[in-house]
Swiss-Prot record:
Protein name, entry field: Phenylalanine--tRNA ligase beta subunit
Co-factor requirement: Mg(2+)
Native source organism of the sequence: Aquifex aeolicus (strain VF5)
Matches recorded under CDD domains: PheRS_beta_core, tRNA_bind_bactPheRS
Top-level taxon of the source organism: Bacteria
Repeat recorded as keyword: no
UniProt xrefs under InterPro entries: aa-tRNA-synth_II/BPL/LPL (IPR045864), B3/B4_tRNA-bd (IPR005146), DNA-bd_dom_put_sf (IPR009061), Fdx_antiC-bd (IPR005121), Fdx_antiC-bd_sf (IPR036690), NA-bd_OB-fold (IPR012340), Phe-tRNA-ligase_IIc_bsu (IPR045060), Phe-tRNA-ligase_IIc_bsu_bact (IPR004532)
Keywords of this entry: Aminoacyl-tRNA synthetase, ATP-binding, Cytoplasm, Ligase, Magnesium, Metal-binding, Nucleotide-binding, Protein biosynthesis, RNA-binding, tRNA-binding
Subunit field text: Tetramer of two alpha and two beta subunits.
Lineage, highest ranks first: Bacteria, Pseudomonadati, Aquificota, Aquificia, Aquificales
Similarity section: Belongs to the phenylalanyl-tRNA synthetase beta subunit family. Type 1 subfamily.
Amino acid sequence: MKVPYSWLSEFVELSDVSPEEIAEKLSLRSVEATVETFGIDLDGVVFGKVVEVKEHPTKKKLAVVKVQVQEHIFIDVVTVDKSVREGDGVIVALPNAKVGNMCVTEREFDGVVSKGLLLSAQELGLEEKSEGVLKIHEDFKPGTDANEILGFGEKIIEIDITPNRGDMLSVRGVARDLSAIFRLPKKKPEEPTYEETGEFFIEIEDEDCKRYRGVVIEGVEIKESPLYIKKRLWQCGIKSINNVVDITNYVMLRDGQPLHAFDLSKVEGGIIVRSAKKGEKIITLDGEERELDEDILVIADREKPLAVAGVIGGLESGIKENTKDILLESAYFNPFRVRKASKKLGIQTESSYRFERNVDIERVDRAQDYAVYLILKHAGGKVKVVKDVYREKYKPKKVFLPQGKYIRYAGESYKNEEVKEILDALEIPNEIMRCGVEVLVPSHRSFDIQRDVDLIEEIMRVKGYEHYTSETLKLPSIANLWKDNLLEVKKYLRDKGLTEVINFSFEDSKLYELLNLPLPELEVINPLNPTQRYMRNTLITSLLRTAVYNDRNYNYDQAVFELGKVFFKEGEENRLGILLKGNKPRTLKEEKWEPYDLTEIIAGIFALFGLEPEFRNAKRNFLHPYVQGEVYLEGEFVGFFGKLHPKIAKELELKGEPFVAEIEIERVLSKKRLPHYREVAKFPPVVRDIALVMDKELDVNKLLIDTKSQIGELLEEVRVFDVYTGEKVGEGKKSVAVRLVLRSKTGSLKDEEANELVNKLVNYLKEKYGVELRT
């Protein structure tokens, strides 16, 4: 948003503050801001008065205009704009003038020498596209520098508004923040008011419109706007249309309240604010026909939609040259509803941009009254009706900030007078109490001030974070800190062929419902996207969303991990999420990921920190009933893993078999053991792979525990590397392939000794669990 320095000066005393200081302080304490200079380079460009217009003697499409450019100096200028009339004020580039990157010279048009150029708004850089010469209706002395007339050279503050600061989307809002930051007195421009009068039908059918105020003005004259309004619009990057439309835009920029004017003759029987009907169509002001549905809020009459509420007006009911009577609208629409309509229709306007960030419901009438005043002043007419339908009056929320909590966050107590001065400048009603401060959240800050910590932020940012003392963070002197540990985990996973992904922490409810998981406890009040308003409580949904996206882009082989935060009412924690799908990377032949690749990776991560996980059976609805497990560490649950349930994979249209895991990495790292020396083995290992057929329901973890106890110290490693179920092993059975790594510390194990140990183990398992050695 662009805000002229001179316009700010109408609301706050800025005589001792430069534009550069404003931008610097805003960037540090409010929103990012920069300074730019308005206008292109002009030299030798002046105001001229047309004294005579003649047709070109040979070229009928041209006119020869005599222009007074000094008290006694007149020049002839040839132009294609035949709308120029005697008495018009124009902007003239004299011979050798500079207009931006263009240099103007005398030029002959079939025997007539043009000693200058009449400039359009487009040539002056005021509008992207314009037709005809720019006409100035105000009376200036011929020869007046065009820079002075057009305001070129004025400093403009350009600010980048964050989604929660809709109150800053106006000159008034920026001035309010500046008043607080610089401790400057505000100015109070006069604000005319118009009481309710007359009768006009207005009905609000949809609860997403809390307030609708309409003013009928009869007998207006549609014409060009006065220069001061045009200049403000140009400085803010908005094209001038006509006096009525320009005034609605002018007031929107000034007060932050979008307005819309309807041609009253096109309104049949009053105004109804309702949801659009499916298949209903409207031709909008940009000339496009758009199909609507029930998600879109419209302003309609008894016959048809007239406008998309908060987004864009309809072409048929728009203001035209022959419009005589108008209905001026000022309203409050639900930000989420406006955002949904804007996204569905693919339109973002200055109006929707503000409604999406919440407008001040209590300023609906005051902003409109100022627009009415300007319309009567510059377009004439008479107010016939003022009708205000305010369904749900704004009730300010009470927020109490205890002094003690402020101290915990800021590191110091506040001075009552200073806090009161800041809150008063921000126009936040407050009462200083013995142990804190209580405020009533004003309507212009209802979107972002919800809790005591929001007040702490307001006080600290306005005061300036540089005024708070800081101390060097003292960390315990230990060998491996949290960050180093995470880097070690990331390196291990990358070495295994996995790629790190970083997902948004915001989720919608669809995946949670599909996975039959409880919805997250935390819901964002002001989400960037209305469909993603939950703060995730698991990484699995984020990873599945990534998998779906990659599949749709024909990337079916995936091995990814995410180290990210999940959120709960009690706080947030870091977790590790893993997703494997399709073929493994970096292999000479196609080799698919298997479930026990997950357990191997998990065990490898634990081994980095001197830990050993315990795997147990699990029953999670979104995982395959026979291919899943839980991870325990020293008897505590720290994660789960498994194959995504085939029905869910099919619903998500995922190709291949997705395997997922989630580890509570903070809890794992909290149990990290210091590394200790282990002597390099002197003797070679003996590896034996055996396949055991057993009941499908048998817990494999029990077999692994018994294997360790039976073989004892000679067993260096035991792990499952494959599971098979099918007709070759019989119904209700499964074949589990186990790898045994045997090693002696005193000498090389002979094959006979290794075979004897394996046979003894198989016989023991057969007797205890009824397993058979698969041949």
